[in-house]
UniProtKB/Swiss-Prot annotation:
Motif NPA 2 location, chain numbering: 201-203
Domain comment (free text): Aquaporins contain two tandem repeats each containing three membrane-spanning domains and a pore-forming loop with the signature motif Asn-Pro-Ala (NPA).
Domain of life: Bacteria
NCBIfam families assigned: MIP
Protein name: Propanediol uptake facilitator PduF
Amino acid sequence: MNDSLKAQCIAEFLGTGLFLFFGIGCLSALKVAGASLGLWEICIIWGLGISLAVYLTAGISGAHLNPAITIALWLFACFPGRKVLPYTVAQVAGAFGGALLAYLLYGSLFTEYESAHQMVRGSLESLHLASIFSTYPAAALSVWQAALVEVVITSILMGMIMALTDDGNGVPKGPLAPLLIGILVAVIGASTGPLTGFAMNPARDFGPKLFAWMAGWGDVAMTGGRDIPYFIVPIVAPIIGACAGAAIYRYLIGKNLPCNTCKLDENES
């Protein structure tokens, strides 16, 4: 690994860890510290956390912070394939680190909450606290319905990210783009969060799930109490969704932008 790629992976690690720390810290404050936070407030904190992480890392790594985005950019936006695996490892490790850091600060409150509610860590009931770290679907949703939700919302996320960062699209760029991406995440979360927790990111979900598994929640953290282990859904569905969103933007929007139309006309002549 050369120095440039190493720096990019470090940036991805730190950026992913940063927004996970903010998000998990927010949910910890809500569930074990008694903070009064509504759905929109939670989504805004997640969104602003992502905006700050993008501001931190965009100049070094491009601020992917999400393996699904990395894979989609590789397939549809000329991102080098040799960087996909290192970026993904860095993102998952960063998400694990963000979860660990938040737990180190809130750990005693977790223990106090479990004692007060006679909750055994690793039981199905303990998913209430495991969901602080990663996402699980609403009880009324099947695994397949949850997968569909994640495909749809990740495709929207990816398509809009490409629109917001496309130099030919005529929308605000530079310092506004990270903030707009954060608002996008908050809007998606506010509209669909109660369904699946709006994972949209394999690293965001699997890294903290792995931490929860190691921290005593065990198999229930991975399965979510479902017959089909739920951890598979936030890995596979966001990748499918991101690729779909990138393809839709590239072939239905991007190629029809004026700058690209001119290039096509020049090539044809």
